[in-house]
């Protein structure tokens, strides 16, 4: 059995999952990021599986996604890279809030994600050497080359 709940952490809504009866006990902790145009709820099956394995999982919504989505789909498609960079910037406060609650056992904090979330995990890794582990599923660390092709020209502006 697990606990799966929405909490406010570091000024934002996160999905929090952990084994039952361990809500306030230190555990190995994973911050998991979702993919572009998705949300923490769509990726919640990762939180469930990891909590069942004994981890604490924190899943934030990226800017303009999930609970933070404000309805501008066309605009969001133009802002992939700023959203990714904001994920990086927000991690420091999120990590501090998780640590401040005493939720991390023995400094065992990892970051993971899928697609844009995997790219987020890789970017965070470059500035947080204290992380114990990083997992990138279906993402890429080739930011410089991707910036030349990924979301450079949105599909609705291209001619056939």
Task: Locate each region found by the language model.
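Serine-hydrolase catalytic core
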Residues: 157-160
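The serine-hydrolase catalytic nucleophile loop
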Residues: 36-48
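Active-site loop signature of alpha/beta-hydrolase-fold enzymes
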Residues: 38-39, 65, 142
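Primarily recognizes the serine-hydrolase "nucleophile elbow" in alpha/beta-hydrolase
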Residues: 94-154
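Alpha/beta-hydrolase active-site loop
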Residues: 78-102
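Short beta-strand element of the alpha/beta-hydrolase
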Residues: 25-35
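N-terminal cap/lid segment of alpha/beta-hydrolase-fold proteins
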Residues: 1-24
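Conserved alpha/beta-hydrolase
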Residues: 49-73
């Amino acid at each position: 059995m697990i606990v799966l709940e929405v909490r406010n952490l570091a000024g934002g809504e996160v999905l929090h999952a952990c084994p039952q009866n361990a809500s306030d006990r230190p555990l190995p902790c994973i911050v998991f990021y979702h993919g572009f145009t998705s949300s923490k709820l769509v990726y919640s099956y990762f939180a469930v599986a990891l909590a069942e394995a004994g981890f604490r999982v924190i899943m934030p919504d990226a800017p303009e996604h999930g609970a933070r989505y404000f309805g501008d789909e066309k605009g969001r498609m133009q802002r992939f890279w700023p959203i990714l960079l904001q994920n990086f910037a927000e991690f420091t406060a999120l990590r501090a809030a998780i640590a401040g609650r005493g939720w991390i056992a023995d400094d065992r904090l990892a970051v993971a994600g899928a697609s844009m979330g995997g790219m987020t995990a890789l970017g965070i890794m470059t500035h947080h050497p204290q992380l114990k582990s990083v997992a990138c599923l279906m993402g890429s660390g080739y930011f410089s080359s991707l910036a030349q092709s990924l979301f450079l020209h949105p599909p609705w502006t291209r001619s056939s």
